[in-house]
């Protein structure tokens, strides 16, 4: 009962937003970032997990989480979709949402999945595609993009988020923001 009320009032999202601004100011930065990194993660859902799709690229039946983090890995926006939503579709929508909350973002780093006019023309934000160097083989840490991958690793430590069990996308988003707020609280507590 309480969770549904907090979810519907976007309380977890507002708490995360306030904690991100507080931590940025504590670090001597402006409250609103000027650059960010965007990526997505596909996760499986349970049988009763509500709306889901199939991500053909990763061969996962479930949901896709699009995340926008600042250059230090602070979670700015997290948006779950069914897994069949392409990065280019979810990314453009996420950047449009970001304009309302973080109007000073000028540049976003992304992977090749976001290399589409739907993303680049969604807002006035410059989208820079970070890709592998030609001829490169094996795993190599890509500049800037590792920050958002680290964020996904952090939230996957939360047992409830390792697999998506929520019946609605709105509830899934609320749990993602609650986990993000918990990360920010730990970060602030360590610096105190």
Residue ranges and their predicted role:
Residues 1-192:
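Short alpha-helical elements
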């Amino acid at each position: 009962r309480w969770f549904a009320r907090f979810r519907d009032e976007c309380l977890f999202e507002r708490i995360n937003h306030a904690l991100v601004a507080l931590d940025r100011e504590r670090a001597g930065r402006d409250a609103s970032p000027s650059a960010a990194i965007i990526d997505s993660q596909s996760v499986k859902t349970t049988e009763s997990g509500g709306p889901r799709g199939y991500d053909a690229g990763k061969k996962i039946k479930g949901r896709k989480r699009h995340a926008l983090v600042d250059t230090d890995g602070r979670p700015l926006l997290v948006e779950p979709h069914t897994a069949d939503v392409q990065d280019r579709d979810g990314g453009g929508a996420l950047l449009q949402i970001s304009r309302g909350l973080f109007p000073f973002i000028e540049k976003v780093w992304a992977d090749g999945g976001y290399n589409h006019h739907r993303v680049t023309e969604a807002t006035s934000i410059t989208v820079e595609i970070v890709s592998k160097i030609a001829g490169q083989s094996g795993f190599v840490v890509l500049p800037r993009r590792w920050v958002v991958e680290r964020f996904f690793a952090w939230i996957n430590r939360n047992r409830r988020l390792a697999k998506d069990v929520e019946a609605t996308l709105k509830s899934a988003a609320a749990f993602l923001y609650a986990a993000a707020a918990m990360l920010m609280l730990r970060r602030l507590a360590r610096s105190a």
